[in-house]
A protein has these predicted regions:
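Sec/Tat signal peptide C-region and signal peptidase I cleavage site
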Residues: 24-28
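Blade-terminus and WD-like Trp-Asp/Gly-His loop motifs, strongest in beta-propeller folds
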Residues: 62-68, 101-109, 146-154
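Beta-strand-rich domains and repeat architectures in extracellular enzymes and scaffolds
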Residues: 46-81
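A flexible loop/linker signature enriched in serine peptidases of the S9 family
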Residues: 30, 34, 54-55, 73-79, ...
Length: 167
C-alpha cells in the first residue's frame, strides 16, 4: 500500500505532461521554397528588348493534322499562324526557352519542351496558348522532342542518357 501514492503521483505526472503537450501550439513548419519559374526569377530585373528578324535558325515547325495551321518556334517563343500565310500569334513567350511544338491529333492542344520549371521538361497547352501544364518533372535526365500517340492519349519524349552534355 505504500507504493500506491507513488504510483498515483507518477500517473498524474504523465497525464499532466500529456495534457500540456497537447495544449502547446505546434511549432510552425519551415515554409516551402517557392517553385522555380524561369519566367519570374527571384530578385531579378527583367526587361524586354524588341528584336526584328527576317529569318530564323534553330526553328521547330509542326503542321496541324487538318493542314490549316503551323506552330513554330523563334528565339525560344512559340507562335502559330495560318498555313496560307498571315500574321503569326505568339502563344508562349517569356524568359523560358519553349521549343518543339507538336499539335495533338485533334489539333486542340500543343505539346512542347520548356525549361520554365528549371530544366527541360514536356508541357502541354491549349492551341491558343492558355492552360500551360507541366506533364513531366525531370531534373537530371531531361526530356525533349514530344510526340503524340495517334489517339492523343499519350506523349512520348526523348530522354537524355549521356553522362554529360555535348554540342
Amino acid at each position: 500500500m505504500t507504493n500506491q501514492p507513488r504510483l498515483v503521483a507518477r500517473l498524474l505526472a504523465v497525464a499532466s505532461a500529456a495534457a500540456l503537450m497537447h495544449a502547446l501550439p505546434a511549432t510552425a513548419a519551415e515554409p516551402a521554397a517557392p517553385k522555380w519559374d524561369v519566367n519570374a526569377p527571384p530578385a531579378a530585373t527583367v526587361r524586354q528588348v524588341p528584336i526584328s528578324v527576317e529569318a530564323g535558325s534553330w526553328m521547330d515547325l509542326d503542321v496541324s493534322r487538318d493542314g490549316s495551321t503551323i506552330a513554330f518556334t523563334l528565339l525560344g517563343d512559340i507562335y502559330t499562324m495560318p498555313i496560307s500565310g498571315g500574321t503569326a500569334t505568339r502563344i508562349a513567350e517569356g524568359l523560358a526557352w519553349e521549343v518543339q511544338p507538336r499539335f495533338s491529333p485533334d489539333g486542340s492542344r500543343i505539346a512542347f519542351t520548356s525549361d520554365r520549371g528549371g530544366g527541360d521538361n514536356i508541357w502541354v497547352m491549349n492551341r491558343d496558348g492558355t492552360n500551360k501544364l507541366q506533364v513531366t518533372k525531370e531534373d537530371f535526365r531531361l526530356l525533349n522532342q514530344p510526340t503524340w500517340s495517334p489517339d492523343g492519349r499519350f506523349i512520348a519524349a526523348k530522354k537524355h542518357f549521356t553522362p554529360g552534355r555535348s554540342l
